[in-house]
Structures are given as structure tokens and as C-alpha cells.
Amino acid sequence: MADPSACVFRSLRIPGHKPLTWCAKCSTMCPRVPCGSVSVPCAFCTISFRRKCPMQQRFFLLGVCAFAFGVPVFPQQGTDPSVGAQASAGDGGMMTVEQAYLNSAEGVVIKEMVESRGHDSKVLALQYIQEALEGGRGSDDLQEALSRLATAGLFRVIREQGRVINDFPDIRLRACELLARLPSARTKDALIQVMCADREPSVVRAAVKSLGEVGINEQDETTATIGWISRKFSAINPTGSLALEILNTYERLAPTVRDRRAVVESIMDIAADGRYAAAVRARALEVVKGVVSGGK
């Protein structure tokens, strides 16, 4: 443990805000603490200092990160601020502290809306998320929010006078559609979870479609789960639109399939099921040819 007396403190001053103090010896910040004046020991130098409300400290912490990684916060003298803004926007991975703060504040607002029980709040959260995705502001926080919206009412049921008040299939459907814009392994896991737990064919269809757009099929996990879903709904609630989307997803994932026999069997079950429309069964015969040839 470092000697507390040897630890030096520096202050970062941002116009219009109170100074933020951090340890110059270990160059670290202590964990965020609840609101109020709380004495927090430095994680490395064991020196205590006072921290204010976390909402105020968030802006300062972003400023520290920006200076540490060389992100421009204020334009240099003799330069045009608009030029710096254009360069920052064009670099892709660079953003100003103000932009980072707005993204953080946006995430807080969306999280509160997602946690709300009301339907209207969740609709508004989806609108905010869609605007963020269209603006190129995708993040892990948005992915987590969409995952929560996609499972709203599935694993936590709230009842009032015996009536379920948090079952929102339209919210789950739209969340599954938006998850396709954030392709990752976490997105794939969230969609598979929705697909296995939801009873609404429309929501399951949206999850299946998004899985095809994400395109991740490690060890045939995605196609195997889709095959199980196909057999499940074929037995309890055969739906032509769901079967058609399953076929389309099989076609998209054909290049990633290892065990083609299992996929072909699932497709042929749809083709041989007389409860589906002729167009769906004809589509199954088209897809099976592509799967056999490896999606070529």
C-alpha cells in the first residue's frame, strides 16, 4: 500500500463547474457512491476525499477520461470550433465530452422508462432507442434496454386483481426488431431467450427474423433452437407466417450450418404439413435446395 503522505492531488477545473480532485500518484478515481457528501478512500493510496452527487460527478468523470485518452474538449486558440466538430464527427471513434455526456444522460432516461410499469413509457423508450440507433449511437446500454423490453412480462408477471398488467406483446415485438440493428453474441442470446419463452407467434416470428439478420450460428445453436421452435408451434399452434419466417432464416444462415441433416428435416416437416398454405410448402422446397448446396 502506498504511503498516504506521498500521494499528491491535482484539480481539474471546468468552466461553470466545481473542481474535481483525483489522485495524481495512482491516477485513479474511487467508485461512485450514493448522493451526498461521503468520505471515500482512494483505492490505491488510502486517502479520503469528499465526493458530491454522482449526477454531477458524471460530467467530471467523462472529462477525466477525455483528457486521459486525448479527446479534445475545448477548441484550441486560433482554430475554428466548427472545424474541430466536423473532424470529431468524421473520426468515427472520437467524440466530445458534451456528446458523451448526452449519450450517458440519454441512457439514464431510457433505463427509467424501461423500468416503468406503464405501456406508454415503454413505447416512448422504444422511440428514443430507435432515434439513437438511427443517429449511430448504438451502445451496450441500448442493447441491455432492448433485451429488457423484449422480455417484458415473460419472466416477471405483475397482476392486479388477478389480471396481468405487464404483458405487452407489441413492445416485445418491436424490441426484437430493433435488436437486429445491434448484432452481437449478447443480442443472439437475448433473441433466443425470447423465442423460447414467448407464446405469441408474432413475437417469436420477429425474434426468428432478427436472428437471421444477426447471422450468428455458433455450433448450430441458432438453427437447432429454431428447429425446436418449429416443431413446438407445429404441434400446438401452426402459424403460416412463423413457418415462412423460419424458412427465410434457414436460408440466411445456410452458409453457417454444420449439421445440414437436422435443418433439412425441419424444412421437410414444414413442406409435408398440410395445415400450411401451398405457398409456404412451396417455399420450403425452394429453401431446402439452398441448404443442401450450402447456401450457394
UniProtKB/Swiss-Prot annotation:
Pfam families, A to Z: HEAT_2
Protein name listed in UniProt: Uncharacterized protein TP_0608
Localisation per UniProt entry: Membrane
Keyword Transmembrane part of the UniProt annotation: yes
Listed GO CC annotations: membrane
Alphabetical UniProt keywords: Membrane, Transmembrane, Transmembrane helix
Source species of the chain: Treponema pallidum (strain Nichols)
TM segment ranges: 59-76
UniProt membrane topology term: Single-pass membrane protein
Disulfide bonds: none
